[in-house]
Amino acid sequence: MFSVLSCGRLVARAVFGGLSQTDSRDYSLVTASCGFGKDARKGILKKGMCYGDDACFIARHRTADVLGVADGVGGWRDYGVDPSQFSETLMRTCERLVKEGRFVPTNPVGILTSSYRELLQNKVPLLGSSTACLVVLDRTSHRLHTANLGDSGFLVVRAGEVVHRSDEQQHYFNTPFQLSIAPPEAEGAVLSDSPDAADSNSFDVQLGDIILTATDGLFDNMPDYMILQELKKLKNTNYESIQQTARSIAEQAHDLAYDPNYMSPFAQFACDYGLNVRGGKPDDITVLLSIVAEYTD
């Protein structure tokens, strides 16, 4: 079987310390990215940090590390619209705003709002829809600020246990909250949520905490216990080890997505709605795997 996997990483200078907190130290995220496009079996892969209709970004600023994932809604393809354009442009805009310092670390919803507003104001309409999940680490306060709209999301793992996670937002089965831009004649007929509808949260993190941010292609195919099993293999806190683990998670999710006999989380969710579904859920998969580390300039 021929498949294509793309992996990337953000090389940040960081020194890993113990698990004890020291207020005088700044923190950073050391992040690796891996993913599959749904059509990866055909050997088709987009350039950059885009996997099928998924997109992601990793950005650094002197005050914070910021990362995000977005999942373009594939249904737009039926109307001749490339779903990846919306998610990719949304993430690139978020990335640019962060690098330009046009954001407040405590307000990731603000980043999403500003980026979405720019898309709305484009002279050439950019049609489409997307979920979005943003994670911001404030270096000095050691607090993680998050915003999640839809069914992408994040996990924070400490000592092998999930200590924080995002809440999935669905209007109804398999219909997540989403940002949308519709043609004028279809406004009001296309499902669209406000960035303010995103579920936001803030909490302290510790050195060595693992943060996994991903699109639903991961969570629909791998339950928490499988993800935690893979994270246990992360023995070394160097970039190569983080990237290898991110790759292993993405590969396993991709394999399970095409297993017709596997009772996936998505299939279990469908059964809760009275649907007779079995097997994995073929989808684009994007995984950002981060470790909280001590920051050195």
UniProtKB/Swiss-Prot annotation:
The gene is pptc7. Its cofactor is Mg(2+); Mn(2+). Its EC number is 3.1.3.16. One of its GO terms (cellular component) is mitochondrion. One of its GO terms (biological process) is regulation of ubiquinone biosynthetic process. It is an enzyme of class 3 (hydrolase). It comes from the Eukaryota. Residues 28-292 form the PPM-type phosphatase domain. One of its GO terms (molecular function) is protein serine/threonine phosphatase activity. Mn(2+) 2 binds at D71, D216. Binds 2 magnesium or manganese ions per subunit. InterPro entries: PPM-type-like_dom_sf, PPM-type_phosphatase-like_dom, PPTC7. Protein phosphatase which positively regulates biosynthesis of the ubiquinone, coenzyme Q. Dephosphorylates the ubiquinone biosynthesis protein coq7 which is likely to lead to its activation. Mn(2+) 1 binds at D71, G72. This is Protein phosphatase PTC7 homolog. It comes from Xenopus laevis. It is found in: Mitochondrion matrix. Belongs to the PP2C family. Keywords: Hydrolase, Magnesium, Manganese, Metal-binding, Mitochondrion, Protein phosphatase, Transit peptide. The keyword Transit peptide applies. Residues 1-27 form a transit peptide. Pfam families: SpoIIE. It catalyses: O-phospho-L-seryl-[protein] + H2O = L-seryl-[protein] + phosphate; O-phospho-L-threonyl-[protein] + H2O = L-threonyl-[protein] + phosphate.
